């Protein structure tokens, strides 16, 4: 048997252990697979990124819409509809006619928040007619009040001019002259001068107690009576 030379064995060993070559087609296929995977990842990222941005924008628009509606609703629907008028004789609770006299009610609410009525005196009390509070002399002369009072029994009584209605004279030029009047009898003939914007719900007895005070010849109370504060309420 022929012996293999050491050099031949070494050469055979090198041939067996040598790495096998990778074909060009295999390399191309691997590169294509990697490219497809990367492209898929990029596409997926862009899709979810755009979806996330759209969601955020939608939520932002929705929040702005809700905020706008909330602000609008506060002015339209959530305005106080009642007020507690605290006087030196007791508490008078009134309902405000927000729909019937919106501009006057808005003005009244604004003045309440500024404490305009705090300390306001009842400057005129006409028995079986009305009580009036204000910081300045009334724009309607006493003679006109009393003359109209004599005629009230002959005129048609409207629902807004019954007893215990809350009103203010028309044609008041500024806030400091804003007066409060509460009728103690039907006054159907003052549509041309009186704006009715509320009615007494509780405290008619307090109004009547104010009505019974002693007055001078100008219908001014001999003893000071006034409003100590007004508290606005959404409900009674």
Curated annotation (Swiss-Prot):
Extent of the signal sequence: none
GO MF, any single term: peptidyl-prolyl cis-trans isomerase activity
EC category name: isomerase
Tissue spec. comment: Ubiquitous.
Keyword annotations: Chaperone, Glycoprotein, Isomerase, Membrane, Rotamase, Signal-anchor, Transit peptide, Transmembrane, Transmembrane helix
Record EC number: 5.2.1.8
Membrane topology: Single-pass type II membrane protein
Residue numbers spanned by region Disordered: 52-71
Annotated localization: Membrane
Conditions for induction: Down-regulated by dark treatment.
Glycan attachment sites: 86
Main location: membrane
PPIase cyclophilin-type domain mapped to chain residues: 82-232
SUPFAM superfamilies: Cyclophilin-like (SSF50891)
Alphabetized InterPro entries for the sequence: Cyclophilin-like_dom_sf, Cyclophilin-type_PPIase_dom
Cited function: PPIases accelerate the folding of proteins. It catalyzes the cis-trans isomerization of proline imidic peptide bonds in oligopeptides.
Family: Belongs to the cyclophilin-type PPIase family.
Name of this protein: Peptidyl-prolyl cis-trans isomerase CYP21-4
């Amino acid at each position: 048997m022929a012996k293999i030379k050491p050099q031949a064995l070494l050469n055979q060993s090198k041939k067996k252990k040598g790495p096998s070559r990778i074909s060009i087609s295999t390399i191309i296929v691997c590169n294509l697979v990697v490219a497809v995977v990367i492209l898929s990842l990029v596409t997926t990222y862009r899709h979810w990124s755009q979806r996330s941005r759209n969601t955020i924008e939608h939520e932002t628009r929705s929040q702005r819409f809700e905020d706008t509606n909330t602000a609008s609703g506060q002015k339209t629907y959530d305005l106080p509809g009642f007020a507690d008028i605290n006087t030196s004789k007791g508490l008078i609770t009134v309902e405000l006619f927000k729909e019937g006299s919106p501009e006057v009610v808005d003005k009244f609410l604004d003045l309440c928040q500024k404490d305009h009525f705090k300390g306001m005196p009842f400057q005129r009390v006409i028995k079986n007619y009305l009580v009036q509070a204000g910081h300045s002399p009334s724009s309607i002369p006493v003679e006109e009040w009393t003359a109209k009072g004599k005629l009230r029994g002959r005129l048609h009584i409207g629902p807004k001019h019954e007893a215990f209605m809350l009103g203010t004279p028309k044609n008041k030029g500024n806030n400091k002259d804003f007066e409060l009047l509460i009728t103690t009898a039907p006054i159907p003939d003052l549509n041309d001068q009186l704006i009715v914007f509320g009615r007494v719900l509780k405290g008619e007895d307090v109004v009547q107690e104010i009505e019974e005070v002693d007055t001078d010849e100008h219908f001014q109370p001999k003893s000071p009576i006034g409003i100590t504060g007004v508290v606005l309420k959404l409900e009674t």
